Amino acid sequence: MTCCEGWTSCNGFSLLVLLLLGVTLNAIPLILNFVDEDQFFENPISCFEWWFPGIIGAGVMAIPATTMSLAARKRACCNNKTGMFLSSLLNAITVIGAAYCLLVSIQALAEGPLICNSQSNTTSSCEFSLKNLTANYKESFDLQWFFEDSCVPHTDSNNPSITNTTANNWRVYNLHFNSIENQHRIIHFSVFLGLLLVGILEILFGLSQIIIGFFGCLCGGVSNGRSQIV
């Protein structure tokens, strides 16, 4: 195994781990939503897990490059110019998918879960458009929704239905509401921070494989020439 093939094989194992991690992280809020509500699309944690950044972006789009890179271990297809060049092209798809995962994760961390932004916790309030990925980047990026005691907008204190509520009932309701709110905030933050890191690492591994693939084309030519002389 040449140095190029060795690095390609290492890249393949790294992409495989990141691929599985991305799919798992993306599936966590979907599974929890189904377990809690016994059906999808009702009271989701956020809109962004339904963009499937980990399942499609960091997962499906990384499968071809991962398979090709792992084949280098057995010298099945990455031991020649064509194989290394094809590996570079497939990793370009991985970089695109990882960039998609990265953009969705940044947007998700900027906006927070639905419980912090919407009165109706349903996917009916979600706008699935690629324009949304860049629409709010001009705004300041912060994580106040996560670090504050509560991210839920305060209700109007002049509302008679609230002023007539007893203090004891309000405290019980507030504690119960915050427990659900904190659960959504922690899951949302953990999932998309993890997907953000997965996207960054996949981009780095993908770009490194693109570069090493072009070097592999040169190494493959030299290796073939030496084998013919021997």
From Swiss-Prot:
Coiled coil: none annotated. It is a multi-pass membrane protein. It is found in: Membrane; Endoplasmic reticulum membrane. Keywords: Endoplasmic reticulum, Membrane, Transmembrane, Transmembrane helix. The record marks F13, S14 as: Cleavage. The keyword Heme does not apply. Residues 1-11, 66-83, 207-230 are lumenal. One of its GO terms (biological process) is negative regulation of proteolysis. One of its GO terms (cellular component) is membrane. Residues 33-44, 105-185 are cytoplasmic. Polytopic transmembrane protein. Inhibits regulated intramembrane proteolysis (RIP) of CREB3L1, inhibiting its activation and the induction of collagen synthesis. In response to ceramide, which alters TM4SF20 membrane topology, stimulates RIP activation of CREB3L1. Ceramide reverses the direction through which transmembrane helices are translocated into the endoplasmic reticulum membrane during translation of TM4SF20, this mechanism is called 'regulated alternative translocation' (RAT) and regulates the function of the transmembrane protein. The first transmembrane helix plays a critical role for the insertion orientation in the endoplasmic reticulum membrane. This is Transmembrane 4 L6 family member 20. The gene is TM4SF20.
